[in-house]
Swiss-Prot record:
Subunit description: Part of the 50S ribosomal subunit.
UniProt GO molecular function: rRNA binding; structural constituent of ribosome
Underlying gene: rplF
Residue ranges of the TM segments: none
Listed PANTHER family: 60S/50S RIBOSOMAL PROTEIN L6/L9, LARGE RIBOSOMAL SUBUNIT PROTEIN UL6M
Name the UniProt record assigns to this protein: Large ribosomal subunit protein uL6
HAMAP family: Ribosomal_uL6_B
Organism of origin: Agrobacterium fabrum (strain C58 / ATCC 33970) (Agrobacterium tumefaciens (strain C58))
UniProt superkingdom: Bacteria
Stated role: This protein binds to the 23S rRNA, and is important in its secondary structure. It is located near the subunit interface in the base of the L7/L12 stalk, and near the tRNA binding site of the peptidyltransferase center.
Keywords: Ribonucleoprotein, Ribosomal protein, RNA-binding, rRNA-binding
Length: 177
């Protein structure tokens, strides 16, 4: 039995939720998102929130139960507060700048890398060594941050590259003579 799935998802203040069959729609101050649950999951809108239950007792239905509840909770938080991910750039000559809506990265290549964010994602560069990716869709924010980090991931010897702000790089010792 899913300990996460048992609890109903509370609808935060300022957010309106609507359940239509397998589709949950949430509208809030930041925008609108929806989640379509699998056929193995039943959704009901109640006074205390959205309750998620497996349609049958199969292992497959139970495995999707907690994940479905968490996805619904994520869309509620996204339309109310939004999500953001911070990235840091370390290295001599490595820097970021905004070029319109596009992100321009100087990462030691012979050319600058230009990244065009998808619709619904905003990128801010408060300092040349700091990037903030924000939006209402948690999965999309994480995906964009991972794509930016992938251009030049942190290396273990000097720690140069793009890393998450909370990430800790395990450093290696160089060659000995």
């Amino acid at each position: 039995m899913s300990r996460i799935g048992k609890k109903p998802v509370p609808v935060p203040a300022g957010v309106t939720a609507n359940v239509d069959g397998q589709k949950v729609t949430a509208k809030g101050p930041k925008g609108e998102l929806f989640f379509v649950a699998n056929d193995d999951i039943q959704l009901k809108l109640e006074d205390n929130g959205v309750s998620v239950t497996p349609a049958n007792g199969t292992k497959e239905a139970r495995s999707k139960w907690g994940m479905s509840r968490t996805m619904i909770e994520n869309i509620f938080k996204g339309v109310k507060d939004g999500y953001e991910r911070k990235l840091e750039i370390n290295g001599v000559g490595y820097r970021a700048a905004l070029q319109g809506k596009n992100l321009q990265l100087a990462l030691g290549f012979s050319h600058d890398v230009v990244y065009e964010p998808p619709v619904g994602i905003t990128i801010a560069v408060p300092k040349p060594t700091e990037i903030i990716v924000s939006g209402i869709n948690k999965q999309q924010v994480g995906q964009v941050a991972a794509e930016i980090r992938e251009y030049r991931g942190p290396e273990p010897y000097k720690g140069k590259g793009v890393k998450y702000a909370e990430e800790r790089i395990v450093r290696k010792e160089g060659k000995k003579k």
